[in-house]
Amino acid sequence: MEHVITKHVLNHLESNSLLYDLQHGFRHSRSCETQLLSFVQELAANSDKNIQTDLIIMDFAKAFDKVPHQRLLCKLKFYGIKNQTLTWISAFLSNRTQTVVLDGESSDIAPVTSGVPQGTVLGPVLFLVYINDLSEYMKSSQLRLFADDSIIYKTIKSQKDCDSLQEDLDAAARWESDWLMAFHPDKCSVLTITNKKNPVKHNYLLHNHTLESVSSAKYLGITLQSDWKWTQPES
């Protein structure tokens, strides 16, 4: 039954173009390769035009485990998942319990009220639904998503562009607060891709934490470098 529900939900989302277009995770005809192809082409085009691109590589804290069930159900309903399908998903989420074992002693059994079940086919699709509206918080920057792997980025020509990117980073922090998710500021980083000798520099902040600037960053199996070289891992 889970496979039937998953297929129904995905078909509904895809046929009505409800999923964010730059989300390539767990979707029909999309993959890690399709994400990398379009992203690398975009970055290469900017580099060819000698345009700087600043990337904010985000890091979710326990992304799949933190999704609140009731808020997820509200989002599913908003996207048109209702009636028997919504009832089944509610039962799928709620019929789960947890207990803590310490030194051989077990705590009382408690219901699990957050998290999409991992190791299931439906869980990842539910996660896509939950983070789908993160893109709506962006005003001038682009957002790339592959499940929870996320990058906020923008072409930079002046400090004003940096300020705009910072505003969208602040907006991501508001989304995080609104929907009870969490980013790891100390694990997020900034990669500036440019061939310019004097690039536009900016200290980006998340929760008043200055994000680390790096010269290279791994993304979906490749390493992006600030001078626009990129390498694949050795097989």
PLM regions and their residue ranges:
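Conserved pre-catalytic core of RNA-dependent polymerases
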Residues: 1-117
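Short, conserved catalytic/metal-binding micro-motifs enriched in Asp/Glu and His
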Residues: 5, 59, 76, 89, ...
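Active-site palm subdomain of RNA-directed nucleic acid polymerases
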Residues: 5-23, 48, 124-153
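Hydrophobic alpha-helical membrane-association signature
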Residues: 39, 126-130, 165-168
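Short, charged alpha-helical motifs in flexible N/C-terminal segments and linkers
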Residues: 44-52, 173-192, 218
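Catalytic palm subdomain of template-directed nucleic-acid polymerases
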Residues: 62-79, 150-174
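Basic, alpha-helical interaction scaffolds
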Residues: 139, 209-235
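Short, conserved micro-motifs composed of acidic
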Residues: 167, 182-216
